[in-house]
């Protein structure tokens, strides 16, 4: 059986019950406010020392109108797509003709393997994609 009296019971009659001066037990006023309160006022030195980049603006954001966002697909994924929907594509000289813009892609990237000879038409191609398409016996056409 534990016979330990509570802290408050021990401190009865001591006027401040372990909180030091009476003013110190009056809410957040003793701490200068709750949380980040006062960071631009009386706690400014701690901001300068520990988190100087907290206030102010740094760098810049490009205008979204100037950012060219192209829908991309990798060569390996394109071949899988072509093999899955063979009937939808035309043949020309034994090669599958793929117009990437018609299926919703503007740029062809070079990740993956390709073994099907294809004529790929797109707005842009990466260098790796060009090499892989030609190595498989196909050709690329930039629109």
Curated annotation (Swiss-Prot):
UniProt biased composition (Basic residues): 1-13, 23-38
Region: Disordered, residue numbers: 1-38
SUPFAM superfamilies hit by this protein: Ribosomal proteins L15p and L18e (SSF52080)
GO terms classed as biological process: translation
Annotated S-S bridges: none
Signal sequence range: none
GO MF terms, alphabetically ordered: rRNA binding; structural constituent of ribosome
Top-level taxon of origin: Archaea
Keywords: Ribonucleoprotein, Ribosomal protein, RNA-binding, rRNA-binding
Family: Belongs to the universal ribosomal protein uL15 family.
UniProt xrefs under HAMAP family: Ribosomal_uL15
Task of the protein: Binds to the 23S rRNA.
Name assigned to this protein: Large ribosomal subunit protein uL15
